[in-house]
Amino acid sequence: MHHLTKLTMLQKDKSAAIGFIFITMLIDITGWGIIIPVIPKLIEELIHGDISEAAKIGGWLTFAYAITQFVFAPVIGNLSDKFGRRPIILISLFGFSLDYILLAFSPTIVWLFIGRIIAGVTGASITTASAYIADVSTAENRAKNFGLIGAAFGLGFIIGPVIGGLLGQYGSRVPFYAAAVLCMVNFLYGFFILPESLKKENRRPFDWRRANPVGAILGLRKYPTLIGLIAAIFLLYVGSHAVQSNWSFFTIYQFNWDERMIGISLGIIGLLVGVVQGGLVRFINPRLGNEKSVYIGLALYTIGMLLFAFATESWMMFVFLIPYCLGGIAGPALQSVVASKVEPSEQGEIQGTLTSLMSASSIIGPPTMANTFYFFTHDDAPFKFAGAPFILGGVLMLLSTVVAYFSLRKHRA
């Protein structure tokens, strides 16, 4: 009886911990979401150029953030395996506050790059949050709990861009002040509320070989059976940048949207992502199984991308979001398969590696998509076709489906 009570209390503690990490992620993503609708306008102001040029700079800004995150994510992941998740998450949140303050006061485009580099160094909250979730999950509820990170993204993107779009009407820098305040609130919340998830006996010494970003990817050689799945995840990440990096610039160019409209549309994307990742994943994935979830999700992503490419009216973008966002069942399913193949003491490392891959995809994806957009929209373009990045994204999603198919078939054999 006493053992049962203890078990119930332990489960309650784990549920509370997942609740805490969900709120921390939610506030983090909301701060990030707030600045998205105004980035195009701020870049245009600082470079005195048009939206086509601003898109190209926007791609390189994301590249600067991603390349620093790529270098530092495995370092941070391994530090969290040694010192625990809590201190690392708190340092990350503090770094983001500093980034937003720098962006708010930036007199030149160089300042934007410096701010993004600082955020890249400390932007490990997702790595550490993923490891945190792995710490407090069982094999049965791991996919469901990873889905909660997606739901925090979704909710943060409902609240953030809508606030950012509305605040952006008072000036392109106002949302940055709001994001900085929000990040400091999150830091304080984490400081007083967030419990540690990594038990002392599950910690391990810091190792520079494991903390090397290229080493983190080469470390995958330990898991040869996972290479195909990781490649499918990588292609999925790169392809999704057709939407992530392009949405604001595409809709400004194609439909002349303002910050408010961009904010509302991103809020709707967030709502749909939240419904899919926080709700549907819990029902669909266990019923379909991870394998079918991967195929159906990737097919829906591909269809959504191709529809965006040929949209001619604003309302079409909203309708086409439905198949695209339903594709979100693929990510947690792939992540769940990968996480189930490694030991508890290695979750921090494998999540750090996945974040490194996400960052590597952000090194390739945004400049590729932004330059594709620029190539087909600038004044001397061979022919004008703003939807070109979506076509490229759709092709990458198709490739991801093929790679996932062969890899999962091998796992069955």
Model-derived regions, located:
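Conserved MFS/SLC helix-loop-helix module at the cytosolic interface between two early adjacent transmembrane helices
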Residues: 70-109
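Juxtamembrane intracellular "pre-TM" segments in multi-pass secondary transporters
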Residues: 4-15, 195-231, 253-254
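C-terminal transmembrane helical hairpin of 12-TM major facilitator-type secondary transporters
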Residues: 291-334
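A membrane-interface helix-boundary motif in multi-pass transporters
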Residues: 168-181, 371-397
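Cytoplasmic helix-loop-helix junction between adjacent transmembrane helices
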Residues: 115-154
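Short amphipathic helix-loop junctions that connect adjacent transmembrane helices
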Residues: 38-55, 245-262
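Helix-to-loop junctions at the C-terminal end of transmembrane segments
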Residues: 71-84, 276-290, 373
